[in-house]
């Protein structure tokens, strides 16, 4: 029986999710269609309701609707609750369920490059993207997890929810780290946060949650210019999609060849 899935967001034309999920479907021999839905700021909640009334099996949610999707759901996973946002929806026993697979997607992609246990990790930015990855990063048992933000107040809001983290402003960064994660939106506008020289002198591994299929993101290029190994978030996109696919279809697809295919576009 043909299963129906979609991703909703605004904008949505650029989304790679249909390509990724169709490749998962071919690999696992599951018949499905996966569409793009342009979100309507006024009618978003009705769009979600209509999708499932029309026998939709699962829905991915992207910017700017993750918080609204979270608020709609009656039942949420623990990681979804801690993230305060949802990117994966499905119906079960006539109730809307929500998950957030971004964090586990990041962890799985990072595992290709380094072990997180006992590492010093710096997250740049204290917005929704940062909040969504803190819990899974803490589960990996790093030595230290620091969130840096332009304004300290916003970072302190995260610290109240996650007391295990330390917070600082960009201006006060002085120490070295094993891993730096850019969770700001600066790369989307081609800008970077210029870090103090001593922060990059230890040559940390650098990861940008943003991605660009055609070229390096601004943060990745900045880190490489500083002599650091750096990658963007395309692998995270594929891994979070795999987790959503597993939630809906109870089959975990493999991701390596799909990631290689997307990189070679």
Swiss-Prot record:
The protein's UniProt keywords, in alphabetical order, are: Amino-acid biosynthesis, Aromatic amino acid biosynthesis, NADP, Oxidoreductase
Q: State whether keyword Disulfide bond applies.
A: no
For whether the record's keyword set contains Metal-binding, the answer is no
Among InterPro entries, the record links this protein to: Aminoacid_DH-like_N_sf, NAD(P)-bd_dom_sf, SDH_C, Shikimate_DH, Shikimate_DH-bd_N, Shikimate_DH_fam, Shikm_DH/Glu-tRNA_Rdtase
GO cellular component assignments: cytosol
**Catalyzes what?**
shikimate + NADP(+) = 3-dehydroshikimate + NADPH + H(+)
Pathway, according to UniProt?
Answer: Metabolic intermediate biosynthesis; chorismate biosynthesis; chorismate from D-erythrose 4-phosphate and phosphoenolpyruvate: step 4/7
- Output one GO MF annotation: NADP binding
Give the positions the UniProt entry annotates as the active site: 66
What is this enzyme's class at the first EC digit?
Answer: oxidoreductase
Which residues participate in NADP(+) binding?
A: 125-129, 149-154, 209, 233
Residues at which shikimate binds: 15-17, 62, 87, 102, 211
UniProt record, GO biological process = amino acid biosynthetic process; aromatic amino acid family biosynthetic process; chorismate biosynthetic process; shikimate metabolic process
E.C. number, please? 1.1.1.25
Protein family per UniProt: Belongs to the shikimate dehydrogenase family.
Function noted in UniProt: Involved in the biosynthesis of the chorismate, which leads to the biosynthesis of aromatic amino acids. Catalyzes the reversible NADPH linked reduction of 3-dehydroshikimate (DHSA) to yield shikimate (SA).
According to the record's subunit comment, the protein's assembly and interactions are: Homodimer.
Matching HAMAP family: Shikimate_DH_AroE
* Protein's name in the database: Shikimate dehydrogenase (NADP(+))
Q: From what organism does this protein derive?
A: Legionella pneumophila subsp. pneumophila (strain Philadelphia 1 / ATCC 33152 / DSM 7513)
Gene transcribed to yield this protein: aroE
């Amino acid at each position: 029986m043909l299963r129906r899935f979609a991703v909703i967001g605004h904008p949505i034309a650029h989304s790679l999710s249909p390509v990724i999920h169709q490749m998962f479907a071919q690999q696992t021999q599951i018949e499905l269609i996966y569409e793009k839905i342009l979100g309507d700021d006024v009618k978003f909640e009705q769009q979600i309701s209509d999708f499932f009334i029309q026998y939709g099996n699962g829905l991915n949610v992207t910017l700017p609707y993750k918080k609204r999707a979270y608020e709609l759901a009656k039942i949420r996973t623990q990681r979804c609750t801690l993230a305060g946002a949802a990117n994966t929806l499905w119906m079960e026993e006539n109730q809307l369920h929500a998950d957030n697979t971004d964090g586990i997607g990041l962890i799985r992609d990072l595992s290709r490059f380094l072990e997180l246990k006992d590492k010093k990790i710096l997250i740049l930015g204290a917005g929704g993207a940062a909040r969504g990855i803190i819990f899974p990063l803490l589960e990996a048992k790093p030595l230290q997890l620091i969130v840096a933000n332009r304004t300290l107040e916003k970072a302190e809001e995260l610290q109240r929810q996650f007391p295990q983290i330390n917070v600082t402003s960009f201006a006060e960064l002085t120490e070295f780290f094993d891993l730096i994660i850019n969770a700001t939106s600066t790369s989307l506008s081609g800008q970077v946060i210029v870090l103090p020289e001593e922060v990059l002198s230890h040559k940390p591994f650098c990861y940008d949650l943003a991605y660009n299929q055609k070229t390096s993101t601004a943060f990745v290029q900045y880190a490489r210019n500083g002599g650091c190994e750096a990658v963007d978030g395309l692998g995270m996109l594929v891994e979070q999609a795999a987790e959503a696919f597993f939630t809906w279809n109870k089959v975990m697809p493999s991701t390596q060849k799909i990631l290689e295919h997307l990189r070679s576009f």
